[in-house]
Amino acid sequence: MSDKKEDCFVIMPISDCEGYNQGHFSRVYEDIIKPSVFNADFNPVRGDEVSKTNLIQLDILNKLLEAPIAICDLSSRNPNVLFELGIRQAFDKPVVLIQEKG
């Protein structure tokens, strides 16, 4: 039996968004999401960390479909985030939805 953890794909903005301080989503990922995912015995993977080919869209699509679980941060209503969430839902894949309070 392998000790390799399964991936948890993290759907969230990977760059700064209007209305948020610079680096906000990087801090959320590094300080909140990653430790929580590790604690749940999964390996966190964000869209900018999946480069297997030269086509990042294909890499993200594969991870969206292959990851046994995903976390989606809806705080910014980012169009790419909502699109990726729609793909997970269209294929009936489990997703944990999170959003900042306020």
Region roles according to the model:
Residues S76-G102:
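Cross-kingdom TIR/SEFIR domain
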